[in-house]
Amino acid sequence: MTTNTTNPWVRTHTEVLDQRALPMPAAWQATQVNRLPTLEVGRSIHISGNQGALRDELITLLNQAVDMAVVCSFLIADPAIEAALKVTAERGVRVYVMLASEARLGSEPNQGEFDQKTHAQHKAMLKTLGKSVLFRTAAHFHAKVVLVDPYTRPAGVLLTANLTQEALTRNEELAVRLSPTQVEGIAGYLRWAMWQTAEHELLDGHDFKAAKLVSSVQHPTPQGEICATTMKHRGIAKQLQQALKNASSHIIVSSFGWDVQHPVVQQLCQRAREGLKVTVLARVRTAAMPALLALAESGAQVYGFKWLHAKALWTDAGDAMVMSANLEAHGLDDSFELGALLDVRQAEELKVRLEHWQNIAPWHLLPAPTLGDLSGEVQLWRNGQLNRVQVLTEAEVNLGEVVAQSAHQLETPRPGVSNPSQSDDPAHQLKCCWTATAPYSHPKASPQMRPAQGNEKPQPYSPKVLREPDGRLTIAITQPSELNAAVQLLGEMGAAAIVIDRGQRP
């Protein structure tokens, strides 16, 4: 559209661009769904949440201990759990706690899982409980379980959550109420890891010292209801690969960590390419993007969360597991990790939990969207970083002023616009506005005279004809009424353009 202005030498243009078909980088699209409440403690599959029900379940478990309580967590930073451990120990119950080493903890904040406040709480907990609880630590301790009386009245819970306040009340986390057989099996792994692989122990509540190994403790024989990753066994990875192979139509998988090069992730991609419905739940993290993009490009539906930390697998073939291991080498190939295999009823309960999260997921990964696929809040994957942008339905941009080729043709092509893939506020419909102005005469142009006939003096052209330093001819006018004559003269002289006499410049 063209609009005339009060200035005869200026014309305003507008053009609406439909940019919806333009390609965009891979993007997390906000889903705008409401987070629906749900029961945190189920029949045997629990989730964390702001009700604190999972934490209460763990405290109840510790309170029922008579002879022994064994806890394994990357770290502990929850006042209620700390108090329950203290009370349990003061009742005369032997309390064993397995944690990651202090050296490992020192590097973890850079990975974004724990903040400095959580570390401070953890260190304070060590001082408080160090004289009544036996702590053994190792860099590879990553399993998360709470067991009580494993050899007399076995009960326990396997978690994906570390025993921190944030993990138990904020994150998307899972926990499994273990059967007596599973408790006994896990106790065997914990016993071996504690006495054979621990690096340090805290006996006096003050200083960690090198741990003495107990050579008589043997690595347990793998059994059917639990899986583990140890320096001698890769049971979790093997179980995952077999479960993925068994699946015939549907797979749901959740993890915090992802490695695109790991065989398990490669197998997931392959099953998606084969046409299986693969649903992926993950935390939105830069480090995970290569794997999550590979999954999405293979056909998986990938859903993102701010705090998800749960690790689990469900398939339509009946295989299901909740585990501490991430889908990467440190977790499936090394480290100390534990997983619980689920029976049919538990598997169905896990599926319900995972589908609930899918339905309330705040983000959905689109591997190759067009701009029209995106709206509202979006995280674009650009140059190895996630950038938050707002995709608008429509927007207006002023493209500035363009000097026309000639005063009698104030129609100018639209100036270029920025690529929406690089914009922080791309719009489906972009209304572009710009002004076209008539060119002015060259400041060093010289007037040209009509050829003289006979003894007549050369006369100027009307309108004026100017020759620019490079030889280009132009017709100079001062007012719109001269345009018709200028156009005629333009043709006669073979001039390049009609310009406005510089003396008329405002």
Predicted regions and their residues:
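Terminal interaction modules at protein C-ends
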Residues: 3, 175, 252-261, 351, ...
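HKD-type phospholipase D/PLD-like phosphodiesterase module
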Residues: 7-64, 72-240, 263, 270, ...
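A generic alpha-helix structural signal
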Residues: 62, 187-190, 351-354, 403, ...
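An anion/phosphate-binding loop that grips the pyrophosphate of nucleotide cofactors and donors
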Residues: 65, 247
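Extracellular and analogous surface-interaction loops
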Residues: 244
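Long, C-terminal catalytic modules of enzymes
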Residues: 319, 325-388
